[in-house]
Amino acid sequence: MKKLVFLTILSSLFFTNSFAYQFVLNSKDKNLINNSKQKSAILKRLEKYSEFKNETKNLDIDKKLGKVNFFINKTLPEFDTQSVGIDDYWMTPKEFFIKGFGDCEDYAIAKYFTLLQLGVKKESLYLAVVNVKASAGTHMVLLYVENKNSSPLVLDNLSFRVLPFSKRDDLTPVVAFNELNAYEFTKDKFTQLVTIDWQNNNKWDRVLNRVYKLNE
């Protein structure tokens, strides 16, 4: 994923959304699946996803995080230009599971919305842009934040283990955001609210609009 530019440290309400998320196929999705050469594989993948959510919904939070991270990480990674022909394209969860592959932000977004369906509060979930040691560009992970004064847990497509950020020596924090706000953070805690400068290319806002309003 390309470098996400952010700054302007201000107290700011980033995005508010009162809708609950539901993973529901619409007529466009069904037509796409029915006309796909991968129809059987797609239906099997969606069936497994549905079964997984039913099996996981009543578990405690630590088990939910671990199982969601493991389940979604089994999906094969593929860079955006290979998968959709667009550089740094952010998929909706339905696109991710129908296509069966994605880039780092697609994993993080799929985990975010899956955990919302499993009853985790959106106030506790943040997409986070990070730098990876000895790697060019930036990377995206999902954070679970129980207390903003403690190290968040990291759900990462590069690791099947859910660990506190303080134990991920390979990652350096940049910025974390969800539907409600955005934060600067360290390995040990969230520090201050920020405003993200999307430079007229707010991919997150587009994902939220497509998910909640367009059911894509």
How should these model regions be labeled?
Residues L4-F14:
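Sec-dependent N-terminal signal peptides
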Residues S18-E216:
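A structural boundary/capping signal
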